[in-house]
Every structure is written in structure tokens, then in C-alpha cells.
Regions:
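Short helix- or helix-capping micro-motifs
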Residues: 41-49, 103
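ER/secretory pathway lumenal C-terminal domains and tails of membrane proteins involved
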Residues: 16-24, 53-54, 59-68, 73-98, ...
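Phosphate- and divalent-cation-binding pockets in alpha/beta enzyme and binding domains
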Residues: 627-631
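Acidic/glycine-enriched connector segments
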Residues: 11, 15-19, 34-41, 68
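Short hydrophobic/aromatic helix or loop-helix immediately within or flanking a transmembrane segment
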Residues: 1, 5-8, 464-466
Length: 1011
């Protein structure tokens, strides 16, 4: 619905701008021009409807559809103000009030909508003033100040002041909880209401009461701030606002009235956030950040879990920090203490903000992330090898002198232009209006993945620097291969020039909307390399602005055709020609945006839940692993006995508290560490310092860490550090309890371990790791504990030897995997997993002809294929070949190549067929997989040398898969097949590169095969 209304407002906006551009002063708005304007609105609206990014947002359960709605609504509303201001300037002011209210509401959706503010200012400017560069620049400065004031002052400070009031009234004045918040809102409401009443009734008493209330409000806000700098800043800013109110009262009360009412309605819209507080008070099962009061609400608004990044001045990726004495202080973290009836500081954040060596810092920092895996990409995109300063310094770890390369500002700009601007914005722009190559995520700029294209081979070959007819298997028949032939782009450029020629003021307005929702976001996001997903949705408002020009392009055609034909005929022809463009866009984009056959997110979420025993605790990691499971439980009520615990969120105290509450049919997670021991700022990191004492009982280890005894801490100046005195732990196994809880099958009781003993090969653990260990130490097998197969080795804490695969999750069991089991992917409970896959699992439409699967879906499906191959291998090892064949057949049936492309995981399927004796199916699949990798290898090897390095991993994988297919055929005496494959392999891979190795077990995991 939001997306539909966005298109309606876009249509109205284009027609309004079209009328202003096509009807010159003194001219009649003829029927032909009316038809042309309606055609322009239709073409522009439909072009945006079928643009890739907007279409994706329209069918995605995210905030961006509603964000587009507010952007479209506000832009149309300011055009309505402009239209009515000529005939009824006083009445038109109501549109400004509506805009303020919409802005307030939009804050609760996404801050991107605030970028329309400068556009609003320039519509006002061009309506009230003639163009002059001086006034134009002043308007731009004012608009940016207004934008910055709302985003960086009003939005955070309204809640920040409430939080400061709360702490001040409770801690300083000794009053009860929430008194400060109540006083804050009463004063704010009273001051605004009284001042508005004064502007209406002109009563001086209202003004005095409101103004003095505002003074009192400002005084408390000032003295309740943390630190001298906050006190001084607040005194200056709030004093200036009070002075401005007083001056406006004497000069223009009408202006003061509009400002106050707009501010009030903006706050009313912003107050939609109170829903979060009300909801949080109910302690719902899903309650992110637990925003029950002003203190926690501030943390929620500040998005503290996402961190921050430098914009105007900051460090390069390899910048060393100065010593901690130079670090800056952050604002302290307060938490409510019910016992003391105070807000207590749990993390003073003193010396918590790092300060970097100036030599490694720059203005406009773009290459700032210090994650180790980002450096190579920074060096590539920034051409650091060609633009750097050399410095010799000591390596702190090795103690050796080494030469480091400090990027120059030119390298910084190279990265900004090459990666952030071109690759992470203009590439997305081209997807929407020129064409798209495929939906494989582009990470390193290679010519085969995620690029734009026109559909004109010569043009695409030139710009992509490759033969576009020659593609890898994963990209063949990719539904996101969309050719627009650059027609929307061309029509948009024509529309831009038409508007420039006929109405420069509106051209500036649309251009500002285009730039501020495009380039300005590029600047603000300051994206690091290897983003977890494509980010085109963030720039949808910029594409919205370009769609305006696409619509106006129809008027360009009308203007051109009307010079050579009848005006009405020209209007019809221009519209028909224009409509060809959204028709092409719809036809090309329909298949990859059609989700009617796909229910993967829901079905696979249910599969994760059904992989667990009753009353289980399932650890997941990341949004994609967690949100669908929450949906299945919250909306459809599926397996609400399973407690889903997100490891990313488990690093926060509020989430741990929520896990300690019951939810639906799930009992509380039995953590034992007291809340005050894990509150934010406490035990966020626990170091591992092996003192050589040998294995330690995990319960004792947890007691050691949670103790506040100074002898249990590492001495680190004023901040003692928590640590484990060993990296090897054990948990005694109560065999009777294991039997009572039916943790393992009766037939496996002989393999029960007396202790679970393992080593954590890490130097430190984070709070989520500590809580997982606490659970394992004290659970005593009462609740089944599972880890989703997608959480990753880091989350497993070295416990893999005690994992048992039961579907899409590993169960922690007191049985140690044998070396053979570990080589074959780990122990599998074949009875449980076979029943889950064959009888319980759903397939999300993977087997439906023409189903649209994006890269994420394909990755999930490949993971499912891998788990089924693992089950088949385990069944084969137990001699249950018929069951294994059923699993393998089901895998091929539910995940055919046309939907889920064959890739490395198919190797294990092939090995399974060989081992059960189905040689025909094995060799047929082997031939297909060999064909795929033979083609892919030729594609990669055909790339120019400048690009080939980015495919080193794929080239190595292709060679290894083909070599192992030959070895499998030899191992199972398929001589003709092996000879054919070997002949083809040696024709494209030199013999010296085919290192002779012993054949790997046929049930080995693909990742292990390809290491």
C-alpha cells in the first residue's frame, strides 16, 4: 500500500512540475498539453514502479517502502503549498504544518526522509525570491543547518534531555523513577502550548507564562547535562533559541505561529516512538533494546549497537592508536537499580574513545575500517600501491622494524570515487535505468558479478571489459539479467534538459532531491568494502527524483513532435513512445521480482525449528538466521516451545534479561550469572590466560569469572580485567540424567563420555560466549541445546567434537565424535535427521518451475543440499543404502539445477551415488558437474589479466572439483568416464598443476574437499 501511494504522489508531482514546465506565462493549457502532462505522469510513475530497487522494496518486509511513501508525500505536499500560496498564502501555510507532521512521523520509519528538507527550502526560495547566486547559496546553507538541527539536535536531544531530566531528578533530587520524565514533558508541553495560544489570542499573559516556562525548561536541561562542555553548549544553543523566540514575537508573530505549530506537530509525529515504550513496558517476547524509559530509549534511538564512523576527519585503516592516556571519554552508561532506587553508572566509558596518530589521519576519511579483511580491498580500490607515503616503525607483536604504507589523500579519493561513488551508487543507478547483469553480489568489481549492462553487446563488452556472451554457470539464465537498453536513462536525460530549458527553478529543486538522496547518502554512509548485501535500497529516493525526469522526458518528445505534427497527435505519440519504456522494464523485471512461488524464508525457518527436540534452546547468529524464525513463532505460532537465542544480541544485557523470562511455551533460559554481573560495561570481554593449571570444571570457571575478588582479575591499571585462568574446560556428565532426558538413543549409551572436555583456542571471549558457557555449565542436560548450522565455527567455542547433526542444527551431546566422524562432517543422528528431512521439512517452492531465487535463497538451498549429502553419507556408512538413495533422490527432486544451480556441494551427492552403486546416475551427474566447472574455468581463464586475479579462488575450486571427479570415477572403476574427464581436464589444465593426492572419502564435506 505504501508503495502504491508513493506512485500516486509521484504521478501528481510529475504532472504539477510538467504543467509548470509546459505552460509558459500567458499560454493556454490546451487539451493536447493536458494529455501530454498526464502521459508524462503515467510514464514517470510506471518507470519508477518497475525500477529494480523500488520494486524490490515494495515486496520486501522492510521500512523502505514506507520511507518512499513519506518522501513522495512530503515532496508532493510542498508542491501543493507552492500551488496554493499564490492565491491563498495564509491558507497554504497548513501544508507546511502537514509537512512538519509527516516529517515527525517519518522519523519513526527512517531518517532518510529528512533529506527532503533542503528541497522544501528551495521550493520556498524559488516561490518567494528571484534567483541570485548569493541568496541561492544562503538558502542552501540555511537548509543544511535546518537539516542538521533536526537530525543531530532535535531528534536525539528531545530524548536525551528527557533522560538527563530523569537522572537529575532521581539521583540529584532523590525523587522516584519517571518523575523527571514527567516534569520534562509537562514543561515542554506547557511552554509550546502557551506560546502558540499567545500567537493566536495575542494575550501577553500567555506569552510570559510560556516564555518563562521555556526558560525553566532550558535551565534544568542545561544543569542536568553531563560535563562542562555539555553545560556550555546547551546554555548557548538554548539561550539562542529563547532569544530567537523573543525577537520573532516582536517582529513577526505570524512567522512565530507557523514555526511553533510546525514544531509542535513535528513532535506529535515524533511521539509515535511512545508506542515502543508502551510496548516495552509489557515485556513482549520481542523487545529490542528494552526501551522502557528515557534512558534505554536514548540507546535505542542512537543505534548504539551499530557503532559509528568518521565523516569529516578520521583515521586510515592501518592507523595505530595513541597510548590510552590520550583516549577521550565517552558518556557514561546508566542503568536502573531497583534496590538503591537510583540510576547507577555501569560503564563510565572513561578513556573509551580511541585517538589515532595524526600522521595516519585525514580530512574526508573514506578508508577508515580497521577490520583485517578490509585492507586488501582498500588497497585495491584506492590504488594504495601507487599512492602512499612510506614509514618505518616497530611491529608491536614481533618487535621487528617494518615498513608501512600510509595512504595519501589521492588514494582516499580513489576509493571514494571508484568504490563508494561508482560501485556503490552509480552501479545501482544503472541497474534501475540502464540494465542489470545478474543478482550475484558484486564484492570486488570483477566483470562477471552484479554489474550493470545495457543489453547491447558491443557497449557492454566495452564497459565491462569482457566478452559478455561467455558467462559462468551461476549466471546463466539468471532472472535478474535485465536489459533496458539504457532507454529509461536516455528519456530521463531528455527530461532533465527539458526542465532546465523551461523551468530552471524546478530543475534545481529536483536536482537537489536527486543529489541529496544520492551523493549525500554516499558521503554519510561512508561504506566499507565487502558489505553483507547490496545496498541499492538506500538510494531509492534518488531514483525517485530521476523518475520525475523520465516523466518530463515525455514532454520533451511532445515538444519535439508538436513542431512537426498536430498537437494532439504529438501528445498521443509521445505518451505511446514513452510507455514503451516502463513496458520493457516490467517485462524484463517481472521474473526476478515475482515471489509468488517462493516461501523459502518461512519454510526454512520452520525447518530450523523442527530440527530441534521439544523445549530446546537454539542458538542463531545474524538477521537472516533469526528473523524468519521469529516470524514463524510470533505470527504462525509454530514451535513456540523452542527458545531462539540470537548470539549477536546476546552480547547485550537487555537481551539476556529477556531470555531469562518465559515466552509462550518456552521456559526461561537457565542462565545463572546475576544481572549485575553482566550489565553493560561489565564482563563485555573475558580474556583467556592459560596459567598451565590444566582442565577446569566449567562451573568453577564461571564462578571464577563472575567473582569480584581482585585476585581473580588481571591487573591492568585502573581497570582490572576479567579472565579465565585456562583455555581447557570440562563438564561432568551425569549419565542417569542424560538417560532420563533421552539426550541420546539407547543404542548410543555405551559411547557416553564421563566428561565433556574441550579447548577454546581464542585469546578472549565476549559476553555472548560467556553466557553460552554459563548455560552449558548449569543446564545438566535438562534442555536440549542446539546451534544452527549457519552460525559459524567462531560461535561453536571449540565444542564441535560433541556436536550431533539432526537437521539444520547441531545438538550438543555427551558423545565425542570419532576422528572418522569428524572427517566426514561430524556425527549424525541418522534416525532423527532422516525423519526430519523426509517427513517434516518443507521446501519453500525450490522445486517449482520458474521460481525466482535470489543469491541469498540459493545460498540457503545449497546449504540444505550439503546437509542432505551429509545425512546420505552417514546412512551409507551404516549400510543403509536404500535410505541414503531416497535422501539423494529427494535432494535432486527438490533442488533441480534449473532452480538451484549445481555447484561444489553436488560433488558429495555424486560420491553418494557412486557408493550406493548407482553408477549411471553418478556418472551422469559427474558429467554435468564437470561440464559446469569446465565452462567456468574457461570463462575465468578468458578474462583479462587485470581481472583474472579476482577469480583465483574460483579457478582453484574448478580445478580441484574436476580433478576429484576424475579420481572418483577411477576409484569406482568407471574407466571410460574417468579417461574422458581426464582428457578434457589436461586439455585446459597443465599436468603439473594436477597435484597427485590420495582420494578423499566420498562423504567428505565440500568445504573440506576444497580447502
Amino acid at each position: 500500500l505504501c508503495s502504491s501511494f508513493s506512485i500516486l504522489f509521484l504521478f501528481w508531482s510529475i504532472t504539477r512540475l510538467g504543467i509548470k514546465a509546459i505552460v509558459r506565462k500567458g499560454e493556454e493549457f490546451t487539451t493536447a498539453k493536458q494529455w501530454a502532462v498526464i502521459g508524462a505522469g503515467a510514464v514517470g510513475g510506471l518507470a519508477y514502479t518497475f525500477s529494480d530497487s523500488f520494486w524490490f522494496s515494495a515486496v520486501e518486509g522492510e521500512v523502505y517502502a514506507m520511507s518512499s511513501f513519506f518522501t513522495a508525500f512530503v515532496f508532493w505536499a510542498i508542491l501543493k503549498w507552492e500551488e496554493e500560496d499564490t492565491t491563498n498564502p495564509i491558507g497554504a501555510m497548513r501544508w507546511l504544518v502537514v509537512i512538519a507532521y509527516l516529517m515527525g512521523l517519518s522519523i519513526g520509519v527512517h531518517l532518510l526522509n529528512l533529506l527532503v528538507i533542503p528541497t522544501i527550502c528551495f521550493v520556498y526560495y524559488f516561490k518567494k525570491h528571484k534567483f541570485e547566486w548569493k541568496s541561492f547559496i544562503i538558502t542552501g546553507i540555511i537548509s543544511l543547518i535546518l537539516l542538521g538541527g533536526i537530525q543531530n539536535i532535535m531528534i536525539p536531544k528531545i530524548v536525551k534531555f528527557a533522560a538527563d531530566y530523569e537522572v537529575f531528578f532521581v539521583n540529584k533530587l532523590g525523587m522516584g523513577f519517571n518523575v523527571g520524565s514527567i516534569v520534562y514533558f509537562v514543561l515542554l508541553f506547557t511552554a509550546i502550548t502557551s506560546l502558540i495560544l499567545h500567537t493566536i489570542n495575542k494575550k501577553e499573559s500567555y506569552y510570559k507564562f510560556g516564555f518563562y516556562t521555556a526558560v525553566l525548561f532550558a535551565a534544568i536541561a542545561t544543569i542536568s547535562g553531563y560535563g562542562a562542555s555539555a553545560l556550555i553548549t546547551r546554555a548557548i544553543v538554548l539561550g539562542a533559541l529563547l532569544y530567537g523566540i523573543h525577537k520573532l514575537k516582536t517582529k513577526s508573530e505570524n512567522t512565530l505561529n507557523v514555526i511553533l505549530i510546525s514544531f509542535a506537530t513535528l513532535i506529535i509525529g515524533y511521539s509515535s516512538f511512545f508506542i515502543l515504550i508502551i510496548r516495552s513496558q509489557a515485556n513482549t517476547p520481542m523487545d529490542e533494546n528494552d526501551p522502557e524509559n528515557a534512558i534505554t530509549m536514548l540507546s535505542y534511538l542512537n543505534r548504539e549497537q551499530y557503532g559509528d564512523w568518521p565523516l569529516t576527519y578520521g583515521q586510515y585503516y592501518n592507523a595505530p592508536t595513541k597510548s590510552q592516556q590520550y583516549f577521550k571519554d565517552g558518556e557514561p552508561v546508566y542503568a536502573k537499580n531497583e534496590k538503591t532506587q537510583k540510576y547507577e553508572i555501569t560503564d563510565d566509558r572513561k578513556k573509551s574513545i580511541p585517538v589515532y596518530e595524526e600522521e595516519y589521519c585525514t580530512v574526508f576519511p573514506r578508508m577508515w575500517s580497521q577490520q583485517a579483511n578490509h585492507e586488501a580491498s582498500y588497497r585495491y580500490w584506492g590504488d594504495v600501491q601507487g599512492h602512499h607515503k612510506k614509514k618505518v616503525k616497530m611491529n608491536e607483536q614481533s618487535g621487528q622494524m617494518e615498513e608501512v604504507q600510509i595512504p595519501t589523500f589521492m588514494a582516499n579519493l580513489n576509493y571514494f570515487v571508484g568504490y563508494q561513488l561508482k560501485y556503490m551508487y552509480l552501479r545501482y543507478f544503472a541497474w534501475n535505468f540502464i540494465g542489470r547483469q545478474n543478482d550475484i553480489q558484486g564484492l570486488n568489481g570483477n566483470p562477471l558479478e552484479g554489474n550493470w549492462k545495457t543489453g547491447i553487446k558491443g557497449v557492454d563488452d566495452f564497459f565491462l571489459d569482457t566478452d559478455t556472451a561467455f558467462v559462468q554457470h551461476a549466471a546463466k539464465n539468471n532472472m535478474a539479467n535485465n536489459s533496458f537498453f539504457a532507454l529509461p536513462f536516455i528519456l530521463g536525460i531528455l527530461g532533465f534538459f527539458f526542465q532546465y530549458k523551461n523551468n530552471k527553478g524546478d530543475m534545481w529543486v529536483v536536482s537537489l532531491l536527486f543529489l541529496l538522496t544520492g551523493l549525500a547518502i554516499v558521503f554519510y554512509l561512508n561504506q566499507y568494502p565487502y558489505q553483507p548485501r547490496e545496498r541499492d535500497y538506500a538510494y531509492a529516493a534518488s531514483f525517485y527524483a530521476f523518475a520525475v525526469w523520465i516523466g518530463l522526458g515525455v514532454l520533451f518528445l511532445f515538444d519535439l513532435l508538436s513542431k512537426k505534427s498536430n498537437a494532439k497527435t504529438a501528445a498521443i505519440l509521445a505518451t505511446v513512445v514513452g510507455l514503451i519504456i516502463p513496458t520493457i522494464m516490467a517485462a524484463q523485471g517481472w521474473d526476478d521480482h515475482n515471489r509468488s512461488k517462493r516461501t523459502m524464508s518461512r519454510d526454512f525457518a520452520v525447518n530450523y525449528l523442527n530440527s530441534c527436540a521439544p523445549n530446546a534452546i537454539l542458538f542463531t547468529n545474524g538477521d537472516n538466521d533469526t528473523f524468519p524464525l521469529w516470524y514463524a513463532q510470533e505470527v504462525e505460532g509454530i514451535r513456540t516451545d523452542v527458545r531462539v537465542v540470537n548470539l549477536s544480541l546476546l552480547q547485550t544485557d537487555w537481551y539476556i534479561n529477556q531470555m531469562r523470562r518465559a515466552a509462550y511455551e518456552s521456559a526461561p533460559v537457565p542462565f545463572t550469572i546475576p544481572a549485575e554481573k553482566y550489565v553493560q560495561g561489565t564482563r563485555d570481554v573475558v580474556y583467556i590466560m592459560d596459567k598451565g593449571t590444566g582442565p577446569m570444571n566449567l562451573k568453577k570457571a564461571i564462578e571464577f569469572v563472575e567473582s569480584d575478588d581482585p585476585t581473580n582479575k588481571l591487573d591492568y591499571g585502573s581497570r582490572p580485567l576479567d579472565y579465565f585462568p585456562t583455555n581447557t574446560f570440562y563438564v561432568p556428565v551425569d549419565s542417569m540424567q542424560v538417560m532420563r532426558e533421552k539426550v541420546v538413543a539407547v543404542k548410543d549409551t555405551a559411547r557416553l563420555a564421563k566428561n565433556i572436555k574441550w579447548t577454546i583456542n581464542r585469546s578472549y571471549l565476549t559476553k555472548n560466549d560467556l553466557m553460552v558457557l554459563d548455560l552449558i555449565a548449569h543446564n545438566n542436560w535438562k534442555r536440549p541445546i542446539y546451534f544452527a548450522v549457519t552460525t559459524g565455527a567462531e560461535a561453536y567455542l571449540g565444542l564441535e567434537e560433541y556436536f550431533q547433526l539432526e537437521g539444520l542444527s547441531y545438538r550438543l551431546v555427551p558423545i565425542k565424535n570419532t576422528e572418522t566422524e569428524m572427517q566426514q562432517g561430524g556425527r549424525v543422528n541418522t534416525d532423527v535427521m532422516y525423519d526430519n528431512i523426509m517427513n517434516k521439512f518443507m521446501w519453500g517452492g525450490l522445486d517449482k518451475k520458474g521460481v525466482s531465487l535470489d543469491e541469498n535463497c540459493t545460498r540457503m538451498a545449497s546449504n540444505m543440499r550439503m546437509q542432505m549429502a551429509t545425512l546420505a553419507g552417514a546412512l551409507i556408512n551404516k549400510g543403509q543404502k536404500q535410505k541414503a538413495e531416497k535422501v539423494l533422490d529427494l535432494c535432486l527432486e527438490k533442488m533441480p539445477d534449473e532452480n538451484v544451480r549445481y555447484e561444489a556441494t553436488l560433488y558429495t551427492i555424486i560420491a553418494g551415488y557412486y557408493q550406493i552403486g548407482n553408477m549411471k546416475k553418478a556418472t551422469d551427474l559427474s558429467a554435468k558437474l564437470f561440464d559446469i566447472y569446465e565452462n567456468d574455468l574457461k570463462v575465468y581463464q578468458s578474462q583479462k589479466s587485470i581481472h583474472r586475479a579476482s577469480f583465483n579462488r574460483e579457478i582453484g575450486q574448478a580445478k580441484e572439483i574436476m580433478r576429484r571427479l576424475v579420481m572418483l570415477a577411477e576409484q569406482f572403476k568407471q574407466d571410460a568416464h574417468s579417461k574422458e574427464l581426464m582428457t578434457r581436464l589436461t586439455a585446459i589444465v597443465p599436468m603439473e598443476e594436477l597435484m597427485p593426492q590420495e582420494p578423499q572419502g566420498p562423504t567428505q564435506q565440500p568445504e573440506q574437499v576444497l580447502q
